[in-house]
């Protein structure tokens, strides 16, 4: 039996989705321009051109809207990790690419984006949402580490869980420092973090020579 095809959404569902997206887009633009705390629900509704009460048909509060933005932000971050995994080159080069992309994404945003990023990370790790999102991010970084182990570029003596935690910690430290330090040299620190991690994870030259020697026997 052929799998059933779900029915196309009706006009009402399409309209609801359109309004939902307009509210998210309006909120993200206002948060970037003015900051999260300075933006009211009424201002979001005015920018989205909907009645104030319509907001609460979609979100219970501004914090609930932030949770959805946080989820979408995580989705984009997971895409960045996947892009880095699919590129050629070594694990070190993939780390350099990932951290460079993260820095570029953050720098392209407006100055108030720092507050938005801080709020979104906080929201994403609240008890109701954090466990699922934290597991997804941890799994994505773990996959990058395991790719390196499979390629013989990450030392077998390094616990992959520890490597994953170091990678995750470096990412969070980079984002938090950028969000809280006005003159933080984001691109330079991102590249330094990637180089450090790449070198720390790498198979030592002595181990590589020993492995090659066994292979020639």
Indicate residue ranges for each PLM-predicted region.
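Hydrophobic alpha-helical connector segments
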Residues: 68, 79-109, 160, 164-167, ...
């Amino acid at each position: 039996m052929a799998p059933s095809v779900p029915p196309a959404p009706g006009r009402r569902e399409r309209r609801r989705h359109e309004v939902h997206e307009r509210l998210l887009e309006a909120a993200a633009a206002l948060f970037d321009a003015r900051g999260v705390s300075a933006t009211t629900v009424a201002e979001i509704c005015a920018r989205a051109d909907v009645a104030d009460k319509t907001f609460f048909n979609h979100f219970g509060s501004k914090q609930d809207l932030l949770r959805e933005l946080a989820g979408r932000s995580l989705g984009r971050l997971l895409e960045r990790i996947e892009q880095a995994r699919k590129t050629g080159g070594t694990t070190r080069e993939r780390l350099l690419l990932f951290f460079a992309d993260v820095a570029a994404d953050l720098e392209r945003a407006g100055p108030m984006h720092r507050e938005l990023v801080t709020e979104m990370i906080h929201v994403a790790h609240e008890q109701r949402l954090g466990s699922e999102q934290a597991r997804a991010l941890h799994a994505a970084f773990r996959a990058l580490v395991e790719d390196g182990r499979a390629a013989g570029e990450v030392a077998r003596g390094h616990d992959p869980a520890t490597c994953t935690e170091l990678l995750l910690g470096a990412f969070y430290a980079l984002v938090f420092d950028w969000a809280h330090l006005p003159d933080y040299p984001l691109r330079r620190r991102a590249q330094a973090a990637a180089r450090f991690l790449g070198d720390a994870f790498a198979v030592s030259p002595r181990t590589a020579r020993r492995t090659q020697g066994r292979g020639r026997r």
